[in-house]
């Protein structure tokens, strides 16, 4: 069973004499920095002088310096920029200041898991990964609650890495809900698999295939959109709130019978075997090497595939239908 830590298991005193640098001020960066500050932690935000986020951070009363200056000052350096930027930021701004006794922290394990960043000996390496977007991490913190987090320690040079990680988790509100102990490997591999096979890749492909099946059979694209994309949120919300069983309890008997008898015909053993292949590529580094090479080469294939996806008929149909829905229509 997983170890779960709560407020009583974490002590903010472990951050009392430590300066924290949050590198980045995006979704997670702004939440971490503001929550830590409100928890009494000495925090600064590291952003390039050309960053448009500098003004946003300063407006929130945060001290903003360059990533290099933040890394030089801080005892704990948390990197919260996109994965593909980590290597450059680390090499140019962090590594020169990563002296023994400091801690390097991450919100996702990708670069450590695949050896893209190799911290020196004498440095603690830990991860605190909220299981929710930054705006939620900030909002519930202000409400006196918290979002669950994953906590992992990759290197414990000081013998205090877990204590520091838990203190950090408490500082952003994570231990109010619970901090689940994991590893960089487990967090990275399961996160990538979930994105690729279920949450993003799997769900997107399933929705498109269902839409195509109905339209090719002669049904109107607008009705197909409602049945295969729009109503997905209704089902996912039920699953999110109470699990699959609660979702099945909440739908009609006809829908439930179709679920339990036809669902396995869609997600067949062959589909599950393909999921296993995807997991294998994550575990053996194939996906990471492919993605890093694609990013380094300028993302031509990636961009092409994304643009092709935008041309799918379901996008045009949705663009026409969503303005009908006042609760989701955008200005």
From Swiss-Prot:
Positions with a binding annotation for Mg(2+) 1: 191, 195
Record-listed substrate binding positions: 252
Protein name as it appears in the record: Ketol-acid reductoisomerase (NADP(+))
The entry's keywords: Amino-acid biosynthesis, Branched-chain amino acid biosynthesis, Magnesium, Metal-binding, NADP, Oxidoreductase
Name of the coding gene: ilvC
Role played: Involved in the biosynthesis of branched-chain amino acids (BCAA). Catalyzes an alkyl-migration followed by a ketol-acid reduction of (S)-2-acetolactate (S2AL) to yield (R)-2,3-dihydroxy-isovalerate. In the isomerase reaction, S2AL is rearranged via a Mg-dependent methyl migration to produce 3-hydroxy-3-methyl-2-ketobutyrate (HMKB). In the reductase reaction, this 2-ketoacid undergoes a metal-dependent reduction by NADPH to yield (R)-2,3-dihydroxy-isovalerate.
GO molecular function: ketol-acid reductoisomerase activity; magnesium ion binding; NADP binding
Pathway: Amino-acid biosynthesis; L-isoleucine biosynthesis; L-isoleucine from 2-oxobutanoate: step 2/4; Amino-acid biosynthesis; L-valine biosynthesis; L-valine from pyruvate: step 2/4
Keyword presence, Amino-acid biosynthesis: yes
KARI C-terminal knotted domain boundaries: 183-328
Chemical reaction(s) catalysed: (2R)-2,3-dihydroxy-3-methylbutanoate + NADP(+) = (2S)-2-acetolactate + NADPH + H(+); (2R,3R)-2,3-dihydroxy-3-methylpentanoate + NADP(+) = (S)-2-ethyl-2-hydroxy-3-oxobutanoate + NADPH + H(+)
Entry-linked NCBIfam families: ilvC, PRK05479.1, PRK13403.1
Alphabetical list of Gene3D superfamilies matching this protein: 6.10.240.10, NAD(P)-binding Rossmann-like Domain
Binding site for Mg(2+) 2: 191, 227, 231
Active site feature: 108
Residues making up the signal peptide according to the UniProt record: none
Gene Ontology, cellular component aspect: cytosol
Annotated EC: 1.1.1.86
Family: Belongs to the ketol-acid reductoisomerase family.
Any one Gene Ontology BP term: L-valine biosynthetic process
Limits of the KARI N-terminal Rossmann domain: 2-182
Highest taxon, organism lineage: Bacteria
């Amino acid at each position: 069973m997983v170890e779960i830590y709560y407020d009583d298991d974490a002590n903010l005193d472990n951050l009392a004499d430590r300066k924290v640098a949050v590198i980045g001020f995006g979704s997670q960066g702004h939440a971490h920095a503001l929550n830590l500050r409100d928890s009494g932690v000495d925090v600064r935000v590291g952003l390039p002088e050309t960053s448009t986020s500098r003004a946003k951070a300063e407006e929130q009363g945060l001290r903003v310096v360059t990533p290099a200056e933040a890394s030089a000052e801080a005892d704990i350096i948390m990197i919260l920029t996109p994965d593909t930027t980590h290597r450059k930021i680390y090499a140019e701004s962090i590594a020169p200041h990563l002296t023994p006794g400091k801690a390097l922290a991450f919100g996702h394990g990708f670069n450590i898991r695949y050896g893209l960043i190799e911290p020196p000996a004498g440095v603690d390496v830990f991860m605190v990964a909220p299981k929710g977007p930054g705006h939620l991490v900030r909002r519930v913190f202000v409400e006196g609650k918290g979002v669950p987090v994953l906590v992992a320690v990759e290197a414990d040079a000081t013998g205090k890495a877990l204590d520091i990680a838990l203190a950090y988790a408490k500082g952003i509100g994570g231990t109010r809900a619970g901090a689940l102990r994991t590893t960089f490997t487990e967090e990275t591999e399961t996160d990538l698999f979930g994105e690729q096979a279920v949450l993003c890749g799997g769900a997107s492909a399933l929705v498109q295939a269902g839409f195509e099946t109905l339209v090719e059979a002669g049904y109107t694209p607008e009705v197909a959109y409602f049945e295969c994309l729009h109503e997905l949120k209704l089902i996912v919300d039920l699953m999110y709130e109470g699990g699959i069983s609660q979702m099945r309890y909440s739908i009609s008997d006809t829908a439930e019978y179709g679920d339990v008898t036809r669902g396995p015909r869609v997600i067949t053993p062959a589909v599950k075997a393909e999921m296993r292949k995807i997991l294998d590529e994550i575990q053996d580094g194939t996906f990471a090497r492919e993605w890093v090479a694609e990013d380094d080469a300028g993302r031509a294939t990636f961009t092409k595939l994304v643009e092709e996806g935008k041309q799918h008929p379901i996008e045009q149909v949705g663009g026409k239908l969503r303005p009908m829905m006042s609760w989701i229509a955008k200005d």
